[in-house]
Amino acid sequence: MTSLLEVLGAPEVSVCGNAGQPMTLPEPVRDALYNVVLALSQGKGISLVPRHLKLTTQEAADLLNISRPTLVRLLEDGRIPFEKPGRHRRVSLDALLEYQQETRSNRRAALGELSRDALGELQAALAEKK
């Protein structure tokens, strides 16, 4: 897999078509293949799904690793957009991934702030002892 990663990491990658003619892979295709091979080489699983895919509330909750009632609260509070074509809510994968990225960013920012506060308190305590 290492050699395949090297090939896919090149600026331009060509494959042979049915009649033997070379075809250059478009950059988004090459990047996607690179990420797939990288994940597989690290023993990770992969899933390829269209980003416009609509999920049930249970599928969405499973993806976010939260309970369905918690997800429904997030939907009803307007934190994640959803559609309700009939009686059931549907959530787009795009909306879930955006929410997931936003919460990760918020968590990192909060952790950074806590770290800075703790460092400041530690420095103040050390300064008092001197």
Swiss-Prot record:
The keyword Disulfide bond is annotated on this UniProt entry: no
Function as written in the Swiss-Prot or TrEMBL entry: Possibly the antitoxin component of a type II toxin-antitoxin (TA) system. Its cognate toxin is VapC50.
UniProt xrefs under SUPFAM superfamilies: Putative DNA-binding domain
Family annotation (InterPro entries): DNA-bd_dom_put_sf, HTH_17, SinI_DNA-bd
Molecular functions (GO terms): DNA binding
Protein name in UniProt: Putative antitoxin VapB50
Record-linked NCBIfam families: excise (TIGR01764)
Keyword vocabulary terms for this entry: Toxin-antitoxin system
A Pfam match: HTH_17
Record's keyword annotation contains Transmembrane: no
